[in-house]
Amino acid sequence: KEDKDIKEDESTKKDDKKTAQKYHGKLAVIIDDCGYDLAPVRKLVNLNAPFSYAILPYKDFSSDALHVIKGGGQTAMLHLPMEPMDRTAMSEGKSTILTDMTAEQVQQLTRKAVDSLPGIEGVNNHQGSKATSNEATMKAVLKVLKQQGLFFVDSSTYSKSIGDQVARSMGVPTARNNIFLDNSSDEDDIIAKIWQAVEMADRNGSAIAICHARPHTAAAWGKVIDEVNASGI
């Protein structure tokens, strides 16, 4: 029993040391895929963390998610469907920006999606590995964003995407995702990625992380949000 108590005490001290460690820097967290399921969105908004929420247009709960997010004083974004390298993997059908569309078609689809979610402050890409690496397509999308005063975050679903570069050249406020937090649905894996993002922000001064409006992700954030808030990041 004494050995067990000693091990528990050592483990507690180790956890306390991590919690007490002070970090510096800024971490921006974007919650993607809002609109499919409202429950994780509610749970995340109720954490009162300064997350940004990227909402897919035209889904069953898109409007409800927007209402919950804005009602909670959080930042709402459009999660704009864009063409992936493999069209057969395209999840959003006719609302997706395609690289073989004319500039006018791209702008029309982009405006329609933006208008469907009044009050959004910015846009990031859903899928889009092919579209975000196509300069002409990105220029057409970003022209609309510039006209409407919206920022653009390149989700970095493809290492050769140029969305943020094109945005910068056009004077559109922009940034690029640095890390995905929930490629695994295991809560412990997600928590480990959250701390990896915190350390990245501390090391570089800032970082952007993307995760998704899913039950396991919401549960993971619920377990660590107080520690992250207390970490100094």
Residue ranges and their predicted role:
Residues 18-91:
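Active-site beta->alpha N-cap acidic-glycine motif
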Residues 23-27, 48-49, 94-96, 124, ...:
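N-terminal start-of-chain detector that recognizes signal peptides
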Residues 103-194, 200-202, 206, 212-229:
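Catalytic domains of cell-wall/extracellular-matrix polysaccharide-remodeling enzymes
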Residues 26-33, 94-104, 183-189:
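Active-site mouth loops of central-metabolism enzymes
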Residues 1-24:
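Terminal interaction modules at protein C-ends
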Residues 58-62, 99-108:
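Glycine-rich anion/phosphate-binding loops
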Residues 65-68, 92, 96, 147-157:
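Short N-terminal helix-initiation segments at or just after the protein's N-terminus
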Residues 231-233:
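Short, intrinsically disordered, charge-balanced linker/junction segments flanking boundaries
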